[in-house]
Amino acid sequence: MKEKIIKAVVLGDVTIGKTSLLVTKKIGFPLEYIPTIFDNHYFEIKINDQIMRIGCWDTGGGEEYPRPLSYPQTNLFLILFSISSRNSFNNCETYWLPEVTKFLPSVPIILVGTKTDLRNCDDYKDKSTFVTYEEGLEMKDKINASAYLECSSLLNKGVDDLFDTMAIIGNNDLKSIIPNQLLRDHYNQSQRSEIYEAQRNNYENNNNNNNNNNKCIIC
């Protein structure tokens, strides 16, 4: 069986479950908060006797992360939001879609609602602001996404379905996508090294000053 490789970039606001989703798929749900500094996760998915290797680029959701560095040769974008965060949902259309279409307008998008377990969580008394499945479908049409899926990393529900969908959609777009001039000019190689090193040093300093051992994330 011939192996195909799909590059997927995972986008979304901070603390909405991007890293937890990928870690859950790989080893199970993480009990501690994992801050993101560019990380890659690889998965093998078998669809119709064909093995596809999906490389997921986990990006930070803050302004300080030079995300476009990870965009060249991308076959698929995942735009995530938390169903408990109306702001992260709205940002899919107002922030993340413009960024994606600015650099790689022809790459397919999968819209993903995370933390669906919170719909049945007693800790949330007022769920009137939660994003419904129907609203997710409407947003899919607004941003012209190829699919809308929901998942819970905590319950490991919908995660496998998401990756199967990624393999199917990504497989249909394995042609090499040449980044436009905006992307080529965004950062040169020296800037990449300086920015990445500054980010890592900043994270290590913050990690030494802040004890996050008791901080958990529900996904």
Swiss-Prot record:
**Keywords recorded for this protein, A-Z:** Cell membrane, GTP-binding, Lipoprotein, Membrane, Methylation, Nucleotide-binding, Prenylation
Q: Where is this motif: Effector region?
A: 33-41
Molecular function (Gene Ontology), one example? protein kinase binding
Q: Provide an example Pfam family for this protein.
A: Ras
| Prosegment location in residue numbers | 217-219
What species does this protein belong to? Answer: Dictyostelium discoideum
Report if keyword GTP-binding is assigned: yes
Membrane topology value: Lipid-anchor
Q: What is this protein called?
A: Rho-related protein racN
Which gene specifies this protein's sequence? Answer: racN
